[in-house]
C-alpha cells in the first residue's frame, strides 16, 4: 500500500502547487523613497504619522513592496505600496513580543493604495531614527521579482489534512482503532517521503505561495474561524545579502484571505523562528 502512495508523491505535490512572487535582492547604493526594497528609508507622505511602539520608539522599515514593480498574483493588489516595519532598537527579538504576534505594537503593516510620487510631499528627513541594531539586515537592498511555483512544506498546519483528503484510502468511515492507527502511520510514511523530495526546495524571499518553516507552524495554535492562510511576505536568512534571522531563521507575515480582499492590513500574523 505504501509503495503505491510513494509513487504518487510527485502527483500530489503538483496537485497542491501554488504560484508565488519570488524576490531576489540586489545591492544598490541608491533607492527612491517609493521603490521596492529590504531595509532603507520608507515612502511616507508628510502628513503621515511615523509608526512607533506604544512607548513612542520609532519602528524600522523591514521591507517595502511597490506593486507597480511586481508581476500580477491573484489576491495581491495590482498597485500601491505595502510596508512592513519592526521594532529594531534591541528591545525585542525582531519586533516579536509574543509567539505568534498579532498585536501591531512592535511591528506594523501599512498600505498606501494611491502613492504620491511628488518628492516635495514626502518625508525626507529621518534623522530621528535610532540605529536599527535589531534588524535582520544591515544594508538597504533593491528587489527584483519573478513568478515561481512553490510546494507546500510538510510542516504546514494544513498539510496532513490535505494528504488525507487527496487520497481515497484515507476517507473510509467506520474503521476500527487498529485500522485508524495503521492509516495514520501510512500518512506519516508518506509525509517522510515527501519531505525527502521537496523540503530542500522550499524557502527563499517571496510574496504569496507557501511558507517555509525551520520549526513548527505557529498558525496551528490559533483559535480563529478563518486561518491566516495567505503569505504576505517571507524573508529568509540569506548569507549572500547579509540577511540573518537569528541562527539561519525566517520571518513570515500572514493575513486572512478575506482581509486581504478588503485590503485590510490591520490584522496580520507575524512569526519568526530560527534553528
Question: Where does each model-flagged region fall?
Answer:
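Preference for intrinsically disordered or flexible, low-complexity segments
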Residues: 1-275
Amino acid at each position: 500500500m505504501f509503495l503505491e502512495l510513494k509513487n504518487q508523491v510527485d502527483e500530489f505535490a503538483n496537485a497542491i502547487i501554488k504560484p508565488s512572487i519570488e524576490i531576489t535582492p540586489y545591492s544598490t547604493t541608491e533607492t527612491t523613497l517609493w521603490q521596492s526594497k529590504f531595509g532603507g528609508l520608507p515612502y511616507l507622505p508628510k502628513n503621515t504619522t511615523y509608526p512607533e511602539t506604544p512607548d513612542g520608539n520609532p519602528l524600522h522599515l523591514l521591507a517595502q513592496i511597490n506593486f507597480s514593480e511586481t508581476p500580477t498574483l491573484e489576491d495581491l493588489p495590482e498597485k500601491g505600496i505595502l510596508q512592513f516595519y519592526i521594532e529594531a532598537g534591541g528591545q525585542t527579538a525582531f519586533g516579536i513580543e509574543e509567539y505568534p504576534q498579532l498585536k501591531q505594537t512592535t511591528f506594523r503593516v501599512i498600505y498606501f493604495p494611491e502613492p504620491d510620487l511628488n518628492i516635495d510631499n514626502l518625508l525626507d528627513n529621518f534623522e530621528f531614527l535610532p540605529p536599527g541594531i535589531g534588524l535582520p539586515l544591515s544594508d538597504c537592498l533593491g528587489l527584483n521579482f519573478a513568478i515561481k511555483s512553490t510546494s507546500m512544506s510538510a510542516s504546514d498546519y494544513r498539510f496532513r489534512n490535505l494528504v488525507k483528503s487527496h487520497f481515497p484510502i484515507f476517507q473510509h468511515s467506520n474503521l476500527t482503532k487498529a485500522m485508524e492507527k495503521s492509516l495514520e502511520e501510512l500518512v506519516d510514511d508518506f509525509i517522510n517521503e515527501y519531505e525527502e523530495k521537496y523540503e530542500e526546495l522550499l524557502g527563499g524571499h517571496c510574496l504569496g505561495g507557501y511558507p517555509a518553516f525551520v520549526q513548527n507552524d505557529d498558525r496551528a495554535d490559533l483559535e480563529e474561524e478563518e486561518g491566516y492562510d495567505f503569505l504576505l511576505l517571507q524573508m529568509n536568512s540569506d548569507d549572500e545579502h547579509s540577511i540573518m534571522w537569528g541562527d539561519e531563521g525566517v520571518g513570515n507575515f500572514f493575513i486572512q484571505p478575506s482581509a486581504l480582499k478588503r485590503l485590510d492590513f490591520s490584522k496580520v500574523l507575524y512569526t519568526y523562528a530560527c534553528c
